[in-house]
Amino acid sequence: MNNWQRILSVARRELRIIRNRPLYFMGSIGVIAFCAIFFLTFLDHGLPDDIPIGVVDEDYSTTSRNFCQQLDATQLGKVVHYNSFSSAREDMTSGKIAAVCVIPEGMNEDIQAFRQPKITFYVNGLYFVSGALAWKDLLTMVNLTNGAVQREVLRAKGYNDAQIMGMIRPIDIDTHQIGNVTTNYNYYLSGILLPGILEMIVILVLIYSLGAELKFGTSRHLMDTSGHSLVTALMGKLLVWTLAFAAIGFVIIMLLYHWLHFPINGSIFNMFIAMFLMIFASEAIGIFIIEMLPVPRLALSVGALYSVLGFSLSGFTLPLEAMPPYIQGLAAMFPIRHYYLFYVQEVIFGAGFAGWWREVIYLLIFLFVPLIGLNRLKKAYIHQNFPKE
């Protein structure tokens, strides 16, 4: 039996194992399908909308009612009226509303008398996104209300609208957003979250697949099937899993940039390259972890920790430049970081090969990492002298 036949024998053996253990299906296709449905529907509108904002109107004037109507008309906010601050505060602490706005009694009279009435905000900071968006919505409406009051006063003094706008807003802002032009959370986050989740799945599933041979005491049978060659055994297993993960990655890219029409300034085919390279690099990391820690439970724990850290250190939520210097260096150890940089250059800037060729080299370097511990894993497979839990 030649080497290729042994690889196919190992691959057929792996397919039988997958068929007999539904955990593999649920841990790969099931998880990524659930996450895709969850994130793509949760962020369907780009930003969370209709965030409940409690309003305690103690003034009951035309101005306060107009303020509430304008706040309710915004995309982000949905006004919930309360008769007292205590009931509004109780609902905010229980998470039913994201913020409370208290309009003081006599606000309209104070405005007419130029006594600067104070509108009080209370924002629930435990829910960062909803709290920040509610704060932004309230602040915007207060500024607009201030402008409306000043406009009416200046109109009464005989100024025309052009002069009034020059006084209310002497400096105009011309904003040009680079990258996420539409300010759409779905476009920006889902394009990284789903590949990041796939990286986690690749690492954990491969660790479990290799560690299960030790856990169930079947590693010697695997070595017999591969002709006592660990490289052949790994190639047989990777033949199955690489095709499976590549198919999942292909569907993710097609889903994002073809079926859902996420904006992309570069080529979708280049994103296929990025996805496949990230999958190969993640497989290499999974193999390396089980080589260094041939104890399934411990290896899975380390693999999960490594995968989660990848989300934090990839830089797509908090810029890497804002992190401590010693943390910035660690970011290069995560394939998702290089996928993110590839993504920025291709999807956002459309830079092409000139923008992401370095990331290709970095991802290819990961493929050599498993060479460090091949002998250690081979001895573990043959002697089975590590804990099986």
Q: Where are the model-predicted features located?
A:
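Residue-level hotspots within pore-lining transmembrane alpha-helices
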Residues: 195-198, 243, 247, 277, ...
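Membrane-spanning alpha-helical segments of multipass transporters and channels
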Residues: 38, 60, 251-255, 263-389
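Selective transmembrane-helix segments that form parts of the transport pathway or gating/packing helices
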Residues: 228-255, 360, 364, 368
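Long, hydrophobic alpha-helical segments
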Residues: 190-209
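Alpha-helical membrane-protein architecture signal
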Residues: 4, 8-12, 187, 226-227, ...
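Extracytoplasmic/periplasmic domains immediately adjacent to an N-terminal transmembrane anchor
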Residues: 1-187, 380, 388-389
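Hydrophobic alpha-helical transmembrane segments
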Residues: 129-146, 179-194, 213-225, 245-253, ...
